[in-house]
């Protein structure tokens, strides 16, 4: 898998109600979206661009020397926004793989971004994603923590069987906290965005279940820790503290 074949896309919108203007909030002297851009660039796996419908976000990324693509404001999901960005940035179809990195992971370890790619060396895999082992009962019981349920394949890789907000699987053994970072084969992303929302997707409010219900294969790489997302003022202060020390 060569760098020229990989496109890392970071969707960013001004949609947060708990943190208005979240992508542009200052973290260690630059907007949060620029911190995420830097982490993606540090991963050094391929071309990186931000996909947004907001001119202010585009201006901040451009001022930081990053690449940006404007997308429509009415997309029903982040995957649809990513697909529009892919078509605009790479109309010739040179990129075979697309990484979707959330725009609120300013402190993500760049190695975690590259860790999502190895499953796609297997031609049977359509989509790859990440998870980290859960170590507390509180995390297991939290419906805001999505659990990845999978069959071990050896090493740190498993084949996803289900994703759920419930506490699963039942009984003794590890449980895994799903991390919303995805790598798609281009053809898989094209297929995914053409599928209608599925029953389990709508029930669980988890977009990735659409792929599983359609028979697509998702493999999961297990990493050491869940990246710190920024959803609340407390999260923002934590990110500022961590990156001010970097």
Curated annotation (Swiss-Prot):
Reaction equations catalysed: 3-deoxy-alpha-D-manno-oct-2-ulosonate + CTP = CMP-3-deoxy-beta-D-manno-octulosonate + diphosphate
Gene: kdsB
GO terms under cellular component: cytosol
Location, primary (coarse class): cytoplasm
InterPro entries: Cytidylyl_trans (IPR003329), KdsB (IPR004528), Nucleotide-diphossugar_trans (IPR029044)
Function, as annotated: Activates KDO (a required 8-carbon sugar) for incorporation into bacterial lipopolysaccharide in Gram-negative bacteria.
CDD domains (alphabetical): CMP-KDO-Synthetase
Pfam family, one: CTP_transf_3
Keywords of this entry: Cytoplasm, Lipopolysaccharide biosynthesis, Nucleotidyltransferase, Transferase
Gene3D superfamilies: Spore Coat Polysaccharide Biosynthesis Protein SpsA, Chain A
Compartments, as annotated in UniProt: Cytoplasm
Protein name as annotated: 3-deoxy-manno-octulosonate cytidylyltransferase
